[in-house]
Each structure stands twice: as C-alpha cells, then as structure tokens.
Amino acid sequence: ITHCTFLCANLYNDMTNELILIKLGGSLITNKKSSQPEWRIELIRDVANIISKSDKKFIIVHGAGSYGHPIAKKYKINEGLDGSYEQKKAINTARMQVRELNEIVRSEMDKVGVECESVITSNTMEIDNEDNILNFPKSDFDKILSKGKVALTFGDVVKNNKNDVRILSGDTILLKLSQIYNPKKTFF
C-alpha cells in the first residue's frame, strides 16, 4: 500500500471537518541520497490531489531531504556555529533550499486549487539545546486555518536560546502541533 493510498482511504472514511496534520518526510518527497536538491513531484502531486478533494482543515509539515540535509551535514550546522564564513554561507543556502522546496509543495497544491500559506520556520521559531520549541507561532497557524487555507511549514535551521543555531526537524514541529491542536488524525 502506498502512502497516498493509505492517506486517501483514511480521509474519505472520516466525515468530520476536523484538523488533520500531515508530515511529508524529506526522504519521501525528495531523493535524500542525492547530493543536490532533487524532488519527487509525483508524490507531492498525489498528496495535493487527495487534499483538493477533502473539506478538512490541514497543516502540512515537510522535511528537507536533499534540500537541506547534505549541506547541513557537510558544514556541521547542527553542532552549532563555528564562526567560519563557509558555515554562515551554508546556513543561508540550507534555508534557501528548504524554502525552495516549500515553494514547490505550495505551487503543486495551488495547481489543484488548494490554497496554502507558509509559516517560515527560521523566521518564527526558536529552540533550546534539547530541541524544545521556545517560540511557537500558533497565531500564525490559526490565521491561516481561519481563512480556510492549508498551513505549510518545514524543518529548518533556527536560532536557539544560546545565540547559536540548531536544526529544528519537521518531526519536532509536528509533535508540537499535535500537542497544541490535539488533531483527530496525524499522518506521517
């Protein structure tokens, strides 16, 4: 059974109009083994088509896959700042790459009539050294959902409370969203 078949079957068997959280893993929507950003458009389109046929509210969190992991690993971004120009440049590149992937996801949703707005993780969230989210933009998600749109967000490089940087994973974001919204269903 494919991820999309499972998602589709579960959405259509549920007639409520409650919030559903979806995590699109980076290795699912990109070729994570690639050293260059490479997306898997078929799966993104499949999910977009499924959502377009639903009247439910959605928050989608996606991973970075090949749009962030290779450069983050190469420059040891999750180990904190090392003061080098190369690492600062790599942080900016990683952020640009995950925003590019977010735009691809948003664009594919838009093509099938699913209106989305993004909550840019590196602009709105901060974590501590144990990956607990300190600043969470619940009001941003609430505004998007109140407009009848799908809220999108993603794993990204964020500031931490020690004036350093860390990678905030999509899984951690999804866990926080689950704690805040207590959704009827969450799909990984």
Segments predicted by a language model, with ranges:
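Ligand-binding beta-strand-loop-alpha-helix segment within the catalytic cores
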Residues: 76-157
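Charged helix-capping and loop-helix junction motifs
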Residues: 38-42, 133-139, 166-174
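Glycine-rich loop at the start of a catalytic domain that most often binds anionic cofactors/ligands
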Residues: 65-80
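Short acidic, glycine/serine/threonine-rich loops at helix termini
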Residues: 32-34, 70-74, 129-131, 162-165
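Acidic, metal-binding active-site segment of PIN/NYN-like and related structure-specific nucleases
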Residues: 177-188
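Short beta-strand segments
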Residues: 21-25, 61-62, 119-120, 152-154, ...
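N-terminal glycine-/serine-/threonine-rich phosphate-binding loop
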Residues: 15-59
